[in-house]
Curated annotation (Swiss-Prot):
Its EC number is 2.3.2.27. Component of the ribosome quality control complex (RQC), composed of at least the E3 ubiquitin ligase LTN1 and NEMF associated with the 60S ribosomal subunit. The complex probably also contains TCF25 as well as VCP/p97 and its ubiquitin-binding cofactors. Belongs to the LTN1 family. Signal peptide: none annotated. Residues 551-566 have a biased composition (Basic and acidic residues). One of its GO terms (molecular function) is zinc ion binding. E3 ubiquitin-protein ligase component of the ribosome quality control complex (RQC), a ribosome-associated complex that mediates ubiquitination and extraction of incompletely synthesized nascent chains for proteasomal degradation. Within the RQC complex, LTN1 is recruited to stalled 60S ribosomal subunits by NEMF and mediates ubiquitination of stalled nascent chains. Ubiquitination leads to VCP/p97 recruitment for extraction and degradation of the incomplete translation product. InterPro entries: ARM-like, ARM-type_fold, LTN1/Rkr1, LTN1_E3_ligase_6th, LTN1_HEAT_5th, Ltn1_N, LTN1_UBC, RING-CH-C4HC3_LTN1. Residues 1-20, 529-567 are annotated as: Disordered. Its main location: cytoplasm. It comes from the Eukaryota. This is E3 ubiquitin-protein ligase listerin.
Length: 1766
């Protein structure tokens, strides 16, 4: 069994090997053999009783219990702990009979494991024992004696949880009445166990020295000692008295042991503490035994008096007191003078060594028991004693702890009183009394006054209490002259106290804290009852948030009552205080006051003035003021008032003092702290005879130019005390103060609103605080000042806020607004019924308006201030709603605010941010109303109604929305219109302010959604109307082709604020809403119909209510515009049967239409519109009817050709006629698309001729394209031409077999020609006149349709164009004039700011590009090969456009690093610029590819010189996405199936605007792909010249996404190539990316292997040698080098490179020698042969090579023979 000594790993739940062995034995034999345990102090044999045979007993124990008992004997703590927990669980869960089987084994296990070193094990043991007791109950009785000793020890465990668990088990086993009996039953066994532990056991006997460390053994031993001592104490305290005597003998033997008494000096504090606790118990329960052992007890206890351990002290002093109380002669057993008292003095001098709170309360009982003999001489004894205490008080530990110092001072005073009361002879008594006052009490008082940490202690209260007791004794006459003794004592005290106080006061630099301490002391001496003693801790209360608010608001009132009681008690005490106290105290105060006023008058001492204020606060008597006046007059202080005024007040010294001194001090400007002067003022007022006198004084003060802080403090102090309030209430309510406060409010408001504030902020703050206080502070539901003045002040504040709203330059309004806010908030929240005043409601409205407007509109920039404003108005609204609920009144605020909001949202003056702020404010207001008025909801309902527009206002708001929205649905055919007012221009929507309809619908929708969220039924009808209007607004935005950013912001705001249809549907049933929208659609049509379609699409179903009108075909007659639009929008959602019925009805109606009804809504126009809408979706089995409709149209034409707008001027044409023609034109493409029956010749003639005639009308009326219906007419005419072109373009046999014989040829020769002869000049004309047509504008839709039609133009038609000639001066060209004109006309349109124009021009030019190189080819023949570095420009018209685009693009993209994807917003100016640039390059590359190899060299040379290609490549790596996955697929690593922009072809459709966001990235990838394919050498050159970062970006991107595509295309082009070489075969291996070329001529055989790199075409193509026969090594190397050079440096495919190389080799075999410079026969760039021969050596060279040789070497010698070259 290896690994025994290893630690058990976490998760190893298998039992130990011995456990498994036991388990195995149990399974095999059914029993566990008995193992005899090792013996301890007990004589039993482990858990196996020795009485019976082991096997016999073991069979009674359950197998699981056996296993657990085994584990409990293990050494490992975790094993024991888990086993014990398992044992407890088993005891709880198993049956009682099974558990009883364990009892014989339990005592031995319990006795051992309950003393375990690990505390968790001990705790678990007691918990398991409890479970065992609960299960076996009385069956435990036989085993009690063996358990009880250890059980009692466990109850005294030093680990509290274990002790608690043991006590819990004990209480479960025995009721409290039976516990003494149970202990008495086992007392002998308990004593045996305890004595063994106390006298016999050692650390080594309790634990195995071989396995347990010494430290652990000792810790366990000391713990068991402690527990045993405590257990013995517990036994003594719980045993019945009658059982005590039987224990005395055994306890006597314990007490006789010296070892026991040594525990009092034990090194472990816990043992000493337990020993002294036991000693106390002995004294308490066995006093006779203790007296017998007095010689041991007294020294053990009394001589330990200086033990300073915190654990020991409480028990020690308890034992000391018990010992001296129990043993009468205890002092005879110790030497008190040498042994006990010196130790006591040491403890006292050291301040109790941090244990004063424990030791000092025991000092008085202790010294009271010291016999007289020991205390002689008493004078020295008491001097030493009290001096020691005072010295201890100066100890730093005592000073730092208030509780320590309090305990010392309290003990000092108690012992002082004790010493004073000692009965001794008179002389000694007098000496002791003098010593105690002069040398002890007064010095202590002096020390406390000078030490701030002691000033708040209990000394002053203790002195007051002591004086009271002495005064009581002094007043009662007695025979033994006690009263005289105490009178003398008091006299001495007051004399010495006066001298001490004068010492502190009579100096210029008097310490302020000391002075305050003196005043506090005098206050306490005068009124000890009023002040709360510092050692009485404040009662702490938990306050819950749901307490009634009124309680919180009346907190100030409660304070007031408390203070008022205090003040009244002061007066009572003053009247009834003893004459023995009053006179000396008043003398003392007068002396100190007189001294202070001298320093104040002569030295301007501030601290003396504050001291004087404190004195007067509690001693405001006329005598004191008289003293002050006398001293003041002596000092010659100038009077503050005229003599006349003085005469009036001459009688009252306090008033004289006010006018002579106090006012002077109050007026001093330098003074910041005024509160103590205000206290003096209250002292003066207190001495006044009447309220009138006080009012006159305060009114005088109000008239004076005093600082506002004085009045603030006067009012604040009055609010905190009803006594003070009663002194000034007349003045507060008076006119003088009221008028002054109104003026103050006016000044403050105006000051804040001036451009430059002049007042310092601090004084301003004080003034605002005064206002706030007088408005918000109410006493007994009355305002401090008169109601009239409150209202006037509120008016001023409201007026100021209104100005703050209107000021344009209001940088300094914020402090003012902030202060007004504080005042208002305090007023609203604390004053009940404050909103009864109209001015209060106006103020509330103004604050709300400030919050509900954008910060830049209100010029408030601090967010904190806005939050403060919000908090203010919300508290105001809460107060208002509570008031409305109780009074049932109407609210001006709610009415006015609703009207203001209504005006704001309907005025069209808000932007998105302003609207958002307004909605947030209104939401907060509504939430507050909902919360406060949840039951009825009437306030909220009324508020929503006030804000909501009426029917007329809604119509006005809808009409104010611009009609720009109509363009898109009209153009797409979703709606059809023939109205007169559409004959004019359409006003565009604004881009700075939101239309009123949008603001109104958003705000009100938010309001009703809030109402619905709060489960209020009221408002449901409003909700449907409002959400319908909101949907109308959203539909208006959706229909705009290019909505301004403002509207996109608005939509984002709605999402953010959860104002959505989805939110409404989640809160309410939408059936009624759908019905409302349907009704409006039927009535009004237009945008309501589109809104209805959107709702239906969202619901994915048509409700029955919506289709009930269409059950019969007559349900929608007569057709109105509303019904027409409703039908058009409903048609996609109708089932086939309903749709078929609708179409039948329309066709029937068309057949019966008269000439007058053709263009009316209820006639042909309406029916055709419905028919077109129905067909737009899909065919549904009515195909056979379609040709019939065509016949009807032809019949109309025959009968009334004037109704058909053929080749005519549309200026005077009615809107009805235009609408009718538009619907007819729309019908024809649908007929071609869905009709299955072949059309007759005359029908085709009608369609073709009508189409051309309508196009002529379109061409002739281009000046009227700004008129919506004319524009739509032009668009649908062009769309018809596009549809016909598309129909005839493929000319598949299936299409042509059903057509008339000559129709296709007629189309090609006449009609198609006619279309493009009309449209191409029109296209040029329209683009020329609308240079800045933005994408999505009205005119642009015509260009889109025109461009779409022109994409079908053929190459020949382009070449035979009839455009006016257009040439550019200085333009180099080889093109014929006709072709050059076409290029010069169309190329600049690639710069046009409309995508449709750019794409259509690209499609037209791409048909021309392959035709252009041949004109340069002819010109190339005239070039000689003498010239070097020839360059030829691609078409000049394209290049000039490219140059312009490069300049513009550089400005946009230069700031973006190469490799970082630049997102281009669709249809922005940047989009059109980038699109034009990429299309231009696509055309250039198409042109390049169509050129011959020789031309390519020249073109590439041009691109290299202009660096255009380099710029392109840099731009492409800004325009291509990092992960070019197609159709939103995301895949980091491309695999064969991943579609990327490189694998998927780009289809540029003129009208296709589906995925515009991916169009630029896809086009950029397409251009890069073509560039790599057709110009690989140039790209490679650029790549090698790039900086390292760009180099890596390009390499990584190309390798990852492009190389694989290009490699496979190159390999497949080799495989599918039809090019044949004479004597050379080419094969390709796609898997290995290899091409193998085999060349054979006569006996020569060459095999070349061309390997494509992984980053093809950036990396070099490697050419490896295969087999070769008949070729010299040098020649072979030359040829391999040539092929590698061709493939690397020529811009073409592998096949082209191989062709060039083969020609070179062929020429070599024909006898033409290599050029000795490039070692090739054919030149790599211009493909020329070596022609220039040296006259000396006759060798021939290429002209280009020779030119390069001459320029690089700066010599004109032959490269070979070095002779001069001629």
């Amino acid at each position: 069994m290896g690994g025994k000594n290893k630690q058990r790993t976490k998760g190893n739940v298998r039992p130990s090997s011995s456990g498994r062995a036991a388990e195995l034995l149990a399974k095999e034999r059914g029993t566990v053999p008995g193992f005899i345990g090792f013996g301890t102090s007990q004589s039993d044999l482990g858990y196996v009783p020795a009485v019976q045979g082991a096997e016999e007993i073991d069979s009674l124990v359950d197998a699981d219990f056996r296993m657990v008992l085994r584990k409990l004997s293990k050494r490992d703590i975790i094993t024991k702990l888990k086993a014990m927990q398992e044992f407890g669980t088993m005891c709880k869960e198993r049956e009682a009979e099974v558990v009883k089987g364990v009892l014989p084994y339990w005592p031995r296990i319990y006795c051992k494991i309950s003393l375990d070193h690990d505390r968790r094990v001990r705790e678990a043991t007691q918990q398991s024992f409890e479970q065992l007791i609960l299960k076996v109950k009385k069956h435990l009785a036989p085993y009690l004696k063996s358990i009880m000793g250890y059980w009692l020890i466990a109850q005294c465990d030093t680990y509290s949880p274990a002790a608690s668990a043991a006590k819990e088990a004990f209480e479960k086993a025995f009721p409290s009445s039976k516990q003494p009996e149970a202990l008495a039953f086992c007392k002998d066994e308990i004593l045996n166990v305890l004595q063994d532990h106390l006298l016999k056991e050692t650390p080594d006997t309790l634990s195995d020295p071989q396995t347990v460390p010494e430290e652990e053994r000792e810790a366990k031993f000391f713990r068991i000692l402690t527990c045993s001592l405590l257990a013995l104490k517990k036994l003594l305290s719980m045993l019945p008295k009658k059982e005590m005597h039987s224990l005395e003998e055994k306890l006597m033997s314990l007490l006789s042991q010296n070892k026991f008494w040594k525990y009092g000096k034990h090194s472990t504090p816990q043992v000493r503490s337990a020993f002294f606790e036991l000693a106390s118990a002995f004294c308490q329960f066995l006093p006779e035994l203790v007296k017998a052992e007095a010689p041991r007890v007294c020294p053990a206890v009394l001589l330990s008096i200086d033990d300073s351990d915190a654990v020991v002290c409480p028990a020690l002093w308890e034992a000391v007191l018990h010992a001296i109380a129990t043993i009468e002669d205890c002092w005879s057993h110790v030497n008190a003078r040498k042994g006990v008292l010196p130790k006591l003095w040491t403890v006292l001098r050291e301040g109790g060594r941090g244990l004063a709170t424990v030791i000092y309360p025991n000092i008085l009982p202790f010294i009271s028991k010291v016999p007289p003999g020991i205390t002689e001489p008493k004078l020295e004894y008491f001097r030493t004693f009290f001096s020691s205490i005072i010295q201890g008080l100066s100890n730093e530990r005592a000073l730092a702890s208030p509780s320590e110092s309090s305990a010392i001072i309290t003990t000092f005073m108690e012992c002082l009183r004790f010493a004073i009361l000692q009965k001794i002879d008179e002389d000694e008594q007098r000496q002791i009394h003098q010593m105690l006052i002069y040398d002890q009490l007064i010095p202590l008082t002096d020390a406390v006054l000078q030490e701030p940490r002691l000033q708040n202690g209990p000394l002053f209260y203790q002195i007051a209490e002591t004086l009271s007791s002495w005064e009581a004794k002094a007043e009662v006459s007695s025979d033994d002259n006690t009263n005289e003794v105490f009178q003398k004592l008091l006299s001495n005290f007051w004399d010495r106290l006066l001298k001490m106080c004068i010492l502190h006061v009579d100096k210029l630099e008097a310490d302020e804290k000391t002075l305050f301490a003196i005043s506090d002391m005098l206050e306490v001496l005068q009124n000890p009852k009023t002040a709360t003693k510092p050692n009485n801790r404040k009662s702490l209360k938990v306050k819950f948030s749901d307490e009634d608010e009124s309680e919180r608001n009346t907190e100030n009132g409660k304070i007031t009552e408390v203070r008022s009681n205090s003040d009244s008690e002061i007066q009572a005490d003053l009247q009834h205080s003893s004459i023995l106290r009053k006179e000396p105290l008043e003398n003392l105060v007068c002396n100190l006051a007189e001294l202070s006023i001298v320093y104040v008058n002569e030295q301007k001492s501030e601290q003396h003035l504050k001291f004087l204020s404190a004195l007067l606060n509690f001693f405001s008597s006329n005598r004191v003021f008289q003293v002050l006046l006398e001293q003041g007059s002596n000092a010659g202080c100038p009077p503050a008032e005229s003599q006349e005024d003085m005469k009036v007040h001459n009688e009252n010294p306090s008033v004289q003092f006010l006018y002579m001194n106090l006012i002077t001090w109050l007026k001093e400007d330098w003074r910041k702290d005024m509160h103590f002067l205000v206290d003096i003022l209250y002292s003066v007022l207190n001495c006044c005879n009447s309220d009138d006198e006080r009012k006159v004084i305060l009114d005088d003060l109000t008239k004076m130019d005093l600082k506002w802080i004085v009045f603030l403090q006067i009012i604040q102090k009055a609010c905190s005390s009803t006594t003070k309030l009663s002194l000034i209430s007349e003045w507060l309510k008076g006119d003088m103060l009221g008028e002054r406060l109104v003026m103050l409010a006016d000044d403050l408001c105006h000051l804040g609103l001036k451009p430059i504030a002049t007042s310092p902020e601090s004084s301003s703050s004080e003034k605002w605080t005064v206002l706030s206080l007088v408005l918000s502070q109410h006493i007994k539901n009355e305002s401090l000042i008169g109601e009239t003045y409150v209202e006037r002040i509120i008016d001023k504040l409201q007026a100021a806020l209104s100005k703050a709203k209107d000021l344009s330059e209001a940088g300094n309004t914020e402090p003012s607004v902030s202060f007004i806010c504080d005042v208002a908030s305090s007023f609203f929240s604390s004053v009940k019924g404050c909103l009864l005043m109209p001015s209060s409601e106006d103020l509330l409205l103004t604050i709300f308006q400030l919050c509900a407007q954008r910060q830049d509109a209100t010029h408030l920039t601090v967010d904190l201030l806005v939050c403060k404003l919000k908090h203010t108005w919300i508290s105001g609204v809460n107060s208002l709603v509570r008031h409305l609920r109780s009074m049932q009144n109407q609210s001006t605020f709610l009415h006015k605010s609703a009207l203001w909001i209504k005006n704001q949202i309907q005025s069209s003056s808000l932007d998105v941010k302003s609207l958002q702020v307004l909605i947030s404010a209104v939401s907060d207001l509504l939430s507050t109303l909902l919360e406060a008025d949840r039951q009825s909801g009437c306030l909220v309902g009324a508020y929503v109604e006030h804000v909501m527009p009426n029917r007329t206002e809604w119509e006005t708001l809808r009409e104010s929305l611009s009609a720009e929205w109509m363009h898109k649905p009209l153009l797409e055919g979703r709606l059809s219109m023939n109205c007169e007012h559409l004959g004019s221009c359409v006003k565009l929507c604004g881009t700075t302010k939101l239309p009123g309809h949008l603001c109104t619908s958003a705000l009100l929708s938010k309001m009703v959604l809030l109402v619905l969220e709060n489960d209020m039924v009221k408002g449901n009808e409003d909700a449907e109307i409002l959400v319908a209007e909101l949907l109308y607004s959203l539909q208006w935005i959706e229909e705009l082709e290019n909505p301004p950013y403002l509207l996109l912001e608005y939509l984002h705001m709605l999402e953010e604020m959860h104002i959505t249809y989805e939110k409404f549907s989640a809160l309410s049933n939408t059936t009624n809403l759908q019905q409302t929208i349907f009704d409006r659609s039927e009535e009004h049509g237009r945008l309501w119909s589109l809104t209805m379609a959107k709702v239906i699409r969202g619901e994915n179903a048509v409700s029955r209510e919506m289709t009930k009108l269409f059950k019969t075909s007559e349900g929608f007659l007569p057709l109105t515009e509303g019904r027409l639009h409703t039908l058009q929008c409903l048609s996609p959602f109708l089932i086939e049967e309903e749709k078929r019925e609708l179409v039948f009805h329309c066709v029937a109606k068309l057949m019966t239409c008269t000439q007058t009804e053709l263009s009316s809504t209820d006639g042909a126009f309406g029916c055709l519109a419905i028919l077109n809408s129905s067909l737009n979706d899909k065919s549904f089995g009515c195909d056979h009817l379609l040709p019939g409709v065509l016949k009807i149209i032809i019949s109309w034409k025959n009968d009334n050709e004037d109704s058909f707008l053929f080749s005519c001027n549309l200026k005077e044409t009615s809107a009805q006629l235009l609408g009718f023609n538009i619907e007819m034109i729309r019908y024809l493409p649908l007929l071609l698309k869905y009709s299955t029956a072949p059309l007759a010749d005359n029908e085709w003639d009608f369609i073709m001729c009508s189409m051309l005639a309508w196009l002529e009308t379109t061409s002739e009326n281009y000046s009227l394209y700004h008129v919506p219906l004319v524009q739509i007419f032009a668009c649908v005419s062009c769309d018809l031409a596009s549809a016909l072109s598309a129909y005839f373009e493929p000319a598949a046999p299936k299409t042509t077999e059903n057509l008339p014989v000559n129709l296709v040829s007629e189309w090609k020769e006449f009609f198609s020609e006619g279309i493009h002869n009309l449209l191409l000049p029109l296209f040029v004309k329209v683009t020329g006149e609308t240079k800045t047509a933005a994408e999505g504008s009205f005119q642009n839709s015509v260009l889109t349709s025109l461009g779409e039609a022109l994409t079908y133009i053929s190459k020949d038609q382009l070449l035979n164009h009839k455009l006016p000639a257009k040439f550019v001066a200085g333009q180099k060209t080889n093109l014929p004039d006709n072709l050059q004109t076409l290029l010069n006309t169309l190329s600049p349109l690639l710069l046009f700011w409309a995508r449709s124009v750019q794409v259509s021009v690209y499609h037209m030019l791409s048909k021309l590009m392959p035709e252009l190189p041949k004109f340069d080819d002819e010109d190339l023949k005239s070039y000689g090969d003498e010239e070097e570095e020839l360059a030829l420009s691609p078409p000049a018209a394209l290049m000039s456009v490219l140059a312009t685009q490069e300049l513009l693009l550089e400005n946009i993209l230069e700031c973006i690093p190469v490799g970082e994807f630049a997102v281009i917003q669709p249809l922005s100016d940047e989009f059109c610029l980038v699109l034009g640039y990429l299309l231009t390059w696509k055309l250039t590359l198409t042109f390049f590819k169509a050129a011959s190899s020789q031309l390519r060299v020249l073109y590439s040379q041009y691109l290299r010189r202009t660096k255009s290609l380099n710029k392109l490549l840099y731009h492409l790596f800004r325009l291509m996405p990092e992960n070019p996955v197609f159709s939103g697929l995301t895949s980091e690593v491309p695999n064969k199936d991943t579609k990327t922009f490189f694998t998927e072809e780009l289809h540029l459709d003129v009208k296709g605007t589906g995925a515009l966001s991916s169009q630029i990235p896809h086009l950029a990838c397409s251009v890069y792909h073509i560039t790599l394919k057709d110009l690989p050498a140039m790209v490679r050159l650029w790549w090698n010249s790039c900086e390292k970062r760009v180099f890596n970006v390009v390499d990584k991107f190309t390798s990852k996404y492009v190389s694989s595509v290009l490699s496979s295309q190159e390999i497949s082009s080799v495989q599918t190539s039809t090019q044949l070489f004479n004597g050379m075969t080419v094969k390709a291996r796609s898997a290995a990316r290899e091409v193998i070329a085999t060349y054979s001529v006569d006996d020569i055989f060459i095999e070349l292997i061309i390997q494509l790199p992984s980053n093809y075409p950036l990396g070099s193509i490697t050419v490896e040698s295969g087999k070769r026969v008949g070729v010299a090594v040098q020649q072979w190397r030359n040829w391999m080098l040539q092929l590698s050079t061709y493939l690397t440096h020529q811009n073409g495919s592998i096949m082209e490179g191989l062709s060039l190389w083969k020609n070179n080799v062929d020429k070599r075999f024909e006898g033409i020698e290599d050029c000795m410079i490039c070692f090739s026969v054919i030149h790599g760039s211009n493909y020329s042969l070596p022609k220039k021969a040296c006259r000396t050596c006759k060798k021939k060279f290429h002209s280009a090579c020779l030119y390069k040789w001459f320029t690089s070497s700066n010599k004109s010698t032959c490269p070979l023979c070095r002779e001069t070259f001629f």
